[in-house]
């Protein structure tokens, strides 16, 4: 989830004000990650109980069989990007595949303009994405002495629920100034953003954090800047899971004859 602000708006701030925005943005991302992970097990158990399904944990699965099934997908993805003219494809993939909340100072003396920014996300008001936006607004209002306020618009209300138009509105700077949207939606604008969804590139939450907060995340921020966006941090929606109504899945053999619905991504469909 890329937590971005329109670059023109960001560049209109002084360097010190930009530091405050970045600090608040990173704290909001850390907060979203924390609450996302804190409720993960509880949400899964409640969902399983309501739907009468069995949850198979990673430790009980033959993960190697899945890794073998998608062996070579990294090279496929690189070639796909190169065929579309993205010469940095290999470097981008290498960054992902190699080994690898509440306090803010008072900066109200920095002559902040009185303004209101609209935050958009595609999920509901009660989602961790919206909570992350609220945390950012809370931190910014405190840091600026109430001069900068943030309105929260969940479910992409400002663009009639259209996620792609939500990102386009962010690029335009109107009516959206800040947003948290999935890399899959961004991949409609630039397929390089699919690199985040390569299978088995994260061994753990700590590994994911290290990549998103390190060189890999810095590269993604560079690409976002090409679209007039300043990325304050990279949040998350948890690890992808396979669900079905037929039987328990422990190895790739259990996937035979199952029809699997995935998001509109060439990479996910290839997997």
Show which residues each predicted segment covers.
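N-terminal secretory/targeting leader peptides
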Residues: 1-207, 225-271
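A gly/proline- and charged-residue-enriched helix-loop-helix capping module
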Residues: 203-223
């Amino acid at each position: 989830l890329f937590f971005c602000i329109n670059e023109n708006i960001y560049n209109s701030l002084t360097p010190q004000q930009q530091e405050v925005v970045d600090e608040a943005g990173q704290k909001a991302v850390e907060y979203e990650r924390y609450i996302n992970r804190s409720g993960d097990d509880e949400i899964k158990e409640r969902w399983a109980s309501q739907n009468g399904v069995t949850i198979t944990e990673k430790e009980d699965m033959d993960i190697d069989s899945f890794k073998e099934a998608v062996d070579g997908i990294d090279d496929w993805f690189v070639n796909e990007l190169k065929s579309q003219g993205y010469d940095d494809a290999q470097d981008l993939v290498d960054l992902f595949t190699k080994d690898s909340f509440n306090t803010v100072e008072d900066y109200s003396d920095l002559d902040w303009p009185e303004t209101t920014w609209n935050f958009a996300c595609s999920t509901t008001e009660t989602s961790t994405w919206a909570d992350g936006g609220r945390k950012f607004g809370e931190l910014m209002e405190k840091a600026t002495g109430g001069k900068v306020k943030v309105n929260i618009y969940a479910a992409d209300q400002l663009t009639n629920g259209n996620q792609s138009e939500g990102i386009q509105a962010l690029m335009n700077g109107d009516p959206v100034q800040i947003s948290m949207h999935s890399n899959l939606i961004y991949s409609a604008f630039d397929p390089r953003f699919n690199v985040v969804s390569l299978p088995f590139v994260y061994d753990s939450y700590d590994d994911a954090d290290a990549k998103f907060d390190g060189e890999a995340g810095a590269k993604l921020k560079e690409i976002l800047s090409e679209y007039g966006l300043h990325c304050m941090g990279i949040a998350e929606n948890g690890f992808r899971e396979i669900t079905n109504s037929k039987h328990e899945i422990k190895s790739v053999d259990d996937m035979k004859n199952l029809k699997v619905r995935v998001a509109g991504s060439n990479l996910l469909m290839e997997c």
